[in-house]
Each structure stands twice: as C-alpha cells, then as structure tokens.
Amino acid sequence: MKSQLRKKTLEALSALSNEDILQKTERMYKYLFSLPEWQNAGTIAVTISRGLEIPTRPVIEQAWEEGKQVCIPKCHPDTKKMQFRTYQTDDQLETVYAGLLEPVIEKTKEVNPSQIDLMIVPGVCFDVNGFRVGFGGGYYDRYLSEYEGKTVSLLLECQLFAHVPRLPHDIPVHKLITEDRIISCFS
C-alpha cells in the first residue's frame, strides 16, 4: 500500500510544471515563515531537497538571513541511524549514496536533538493527522522517537490523503503546511 501511494504521489508531482511548483511553494513558504514555531526557533533542522521533493533551499536561505542555525541530516546506513549536523556553507556538503547531499563530518558539528527548535520533516505523502509515508528508509521515524521539539512538513495538496498506512512506530508531525493551508495535527 505504501509503495502504491508513493508511486501515485510521485506521478502527480511529476505532472506539475516548474511554474506551478514555484507558485505553490512560494505560498507555502509564506505560511511557514509566519508560524510562531518558525519565528521563535533558533535552530532549524531541514533536509537538502532533491528531485521531486519540496525545494528546501529557499527555507535554508531564509533561516540564514534571519540568523538561525541550520542543521541537516547525516544518515548512517550501517546503523540505520541519523544525526543532524551544522550547515553554513556548501563546501560542507558531500554527495553520498543515492545522490543525497549530506554534511561532511570533519567540517561540521553534531547538533543534539534537544538543541533543535523546529524540524522540517520530509515525506512523499501525508494524511490529515500528520502521519507520513517517506522514502522507505525509516531514518526519520527512528529519529523522531527521541525528538521532543516541534515538527512541520511542507507538502502540496496533491500529496495529502485522508489516510496513509501507519505502523505502531510511526510518529506524526505537529503541523502540515500546503500551498493552501496550515493543518494542526495534534498538540
């Protein structure tokens, strides 16, 4: 079921023009930057987007412009764990498996979960309760089980479903932000 939802959602995203995506994400970013969770955050955790993911570069640049610390994930496939590390310049990045851009350990510092004020959690599709279908690695679900801060996800309306399959270890995000609205999932 998850793989079918992933496929359906990625097909819908592929059908959008670059202009559509740009217009929709600009509205989404305005919602994000207006949230108290964003405005009060000193440290933001976010991925470096690629492919059909919601572009995160504008989010990173806005955070830097506002003097916020940005941290990005470093995945450890051998342990299936993830950590967040500081990110200030592109020379701190390296291309790893599957073409992902991740922080270079020697050029960055680890950020403890308790230091992250707001985490922007990626996903392929979501339901209105904040549950998500990711890319299948389980890294975020494992990390979120130990993270107590605020979480939001950025998505287009075509990525939103009434229900997505969930497992007992799945953890919902607090808020979903689309091009049309902010959905508070739970408190």
From Swiss-Prot:
One of its GO terms (biological process) is tetrahydrofolate interconversion. Pfam families: 5-FTHF_cyc-lig (PF01812). Keywords: ATP-binding, Nucleotide-binding. The keyword Mitochondrion does not apply. GO terms for molecular function: 5-formyltetrahydrofolate cyclo-ligase activity; ATP binding. GO terms for cellular component: cytoplasm. The keyword ATP-binding applies. It comes from the Bacteria. ATP binds at residues 2-6, 134-141, 170. Gene3D superfamilies: NagB/RpiA/CoA transferase-like (3.40.50.10420). InterPro entries: FTHF_cligase, FTHF_cligase-like_sf, NagB/RpiA_transferase-like. NCBIfam families: MTHFS_bact. Belongs to the 5-formyltetrahydrofolate cyclo-ligase family. This is Uncharacterized protein YqgN. It comes from Bacillus subtilis (strain 168). The lineage of its organism: Bacteria, Bacillati, Bacillota, Bacilli, Bacillales. The gene is yqgN.
